[in-house]
């Protein structure tokens, strides 16, 4: 395993749990504790994890927002499995909005490059991915947030208020039965709120780590979601609560 791949796996393992010890990471990856400690120091310097006594913990909290780069390396297998299922919702001639985010980016990578949809997004990175070959793509315009690479602000909001979409692929930082869908940033929350409002069908694409978490600003209730696609398997209580809000749940897609 190359050093870059080893470090990516460390971030993934730490982020997918409440934390990992040096010993656990060493056993899992097959490298010495000294190597793991050096990697953790470097990853903390890059803002990808936080070191704790004897190991490392994720950097997330209610008011704290991970960067695009931090999220990009987390649970890639799960995100790709979600994307495989998500593109089954596409139909010829649709106008499809892709929310800015790392899971929606994986969905964009799976979209057929045959020009059968019109893609719209507030993510310049995602627009480049969609624009390969024959697909037509429109950007919202607006101010680019450095942390998440998402376009926000009055120009982006004005675009949203004048447009409508057949389908929305929506991401979230957190999903909680009581709080609904939440995100750390108010400008992004407003954009997501408009996406949901203007879409005929809302497909939430989020890995199971988002469930049971709350962030700073609510942008949608569960009742506004039509379909929830996730990698892991929901427990019976969570499934019942989400489905009782009228949401169709497709879980366990990474099995």
UniProtKB/Swiss-Prot annotation:
Residue ranges crossing the lipid bilayer per the database entry: none
Pfam name, any one: DeoRC
UniProt cross-references to CDD domains, sorted A to Z: HTH_ARSR
Transcription regulation keyword on record: yes
GO molecular function: DNA binding; DNA-binding transcription factor activity
Induction of expression: Expression is repressed by glycerol but highly up-regulated in the presence of fructose or glucose, regardless of glycerol supplementation.
Segments forming domain HTH deoR-type: 3-58
DNA-binding region listed in the record: 20-39
Keywords: Carbohydrate metabolism, DNA-binding, Fucose metabolism, Glucose metabolism, Repressor, Transcription, Transcription regulation
Protein name: HTH-type transcriptional regulator GlpR
Protein's organism: Haloferax volcanii (strain ATCC 29605 / DSM 3757 / JCM 8879 / NBRC 14742 / NCIMB 2012 / VKM B-1768 / DS2) (Halobacterium volcanii)
Lineage: Archaea, Methanobacteriati, Methanobacteriota, Stenosarchaea group, Halobacteria
Gene (UniProt): glpR
